[in-house]
A protein has these predicted regions:
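Membrane-interfacial helical/loop segments at transmembrane boundaries in membrane proteins
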Residues: 1-4, 77-84
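Short, strongly hydrophobic alpha-helical membrane anchors
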Residues: 1-13
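Membrane-interface helix-loop junction between the first two transmembrane segments
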Residues: 28-47
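Membrane-embedded catalytic scaffold of the fatty acid hydroxylase/desaturase
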Residues: 53-68, 75, 83, 89-244
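A membrane-cytosol interface segment of integral membrane proteins
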Residues: 242-280
């Protein structure tokens, strides 16, 4: 484990890029063989806006990486944060706790807030307005959302006191996890259900992408499912009944245009409606 952390402490940008491309490529190919839905779409055309926003996310994270490194170095050298206040533990436990709480503060918490605060929801709407959710949807985030997510990651590092090796390992696992749980793949139902007791499975996250409440406001986790189960935000829904998108912004053509998506956070707010299935 120490060797792994030492590698991630100095992981080259080229290796992180390779991880991103490899994950996308793997799940892209897998989608063609074990698809959950057979979308009638041009997969490459659909991917263009999603890859554009993936690129903007990469640029923002690259430009602000010095802040992540600076805060991590500061908390580590000053023995500040939860991980530094704990008694000496085996390194694997320390790493696990770091990733667990970074997932809470850096992923679950901002995601939950984006669904509860109207201006944040209008920003996050760009992610939800994809009508054919697949692995390219994973990083379909408006640049403003990328800034929000990055800020919460900084807060997570400050609170946990995680060293940069743990932070980079967390971000790498988070990347693969979000590519996996957005991928248009169909696992055996029992396998998916078992997986969802510990991690965010594809079916679990797809429920979050159903087009109407209350399912849209559920399953906020990214890596671990414990936070949704602990805070009462977990919901299950039949994957065969899923409809992607958002009920009040259902113009599929507009939701596939980069220029429209960039302006989407500044559109008038429309109150979502509830799904009749939630009453069953």
């Amino acid at each position: 484990m120490q060797t792994i952390i030492e590698y991630f402490e100095t992981i080259p940008s080229s290796h992180r890029t390779l991880l991103l491309i490899s994950g996308l490529s793997f799940f892209w190919i897998l989608e063609n063989n074990v698809s959950l839905f057979r979308f009638k779409y041009n997969k490459w055309k659909h991917a263009i806006p999603n890859l554009f926003f993936t690129l903007t996310t990469i640029i923002i994270n690259f430009l602000l990486a010095f802040l992540l490194l600076s805060i991590s170095d500061t908390v580590t050298s000053n023995k500040f944060g939860l991980l530094n206040w704990l008694p000496i533990l085996p390194i694997w436990i320390n790493v696990f706790l770091g990733i667990l709480f970074l997932d809470l503060i850096g992923a679950y918490l901002p995601h939950w807030l984006e669904h509860k605060i109207k201006p944040l929801w209008m920003i996050h709407l760009v992610h939800h307005s994809d009508h054919q959710v697949d692995t390219t949807t994973a990083n379909r985030h408006h640049p403003l959302e990328s800034l929000i997510r990055f800020t919460f990651t900084l807060i997570g590092v400050l609170i946990t006191g995680a060293n940069i090796g743990i932070v980079m390992l967390y971000q790498s696992i988070s990347l693969i996890s979000t590519q996996f749980n957005h991928a248009n793949i169909k696992l055996p139902k029992r396998v998916d259900l078992f997986l969802s007791y510990f991690f965010v499975s594809p079916d679990m996250h797809k429920t979050h992408h159903h087009y109407r409440l209350p399912f849209t406001d559920s399953n906020f986790g990214n890596i671990f499912s414990i936070w949704d189960r602990l805070f009462g935000t977990y919901k299950a829904f039949s994957r065969e009944k899923l409809i992607y998108g958002v009920d009040v912004f259902f113009d599929e053509n507009a939701n596939g245009k980069i220029e429209t998506l960039l302006k989407q956070p500044f559109q008038p707010y429309s109150k979502p409606t509830f799904s009749p299935e939630s009453k069953n």
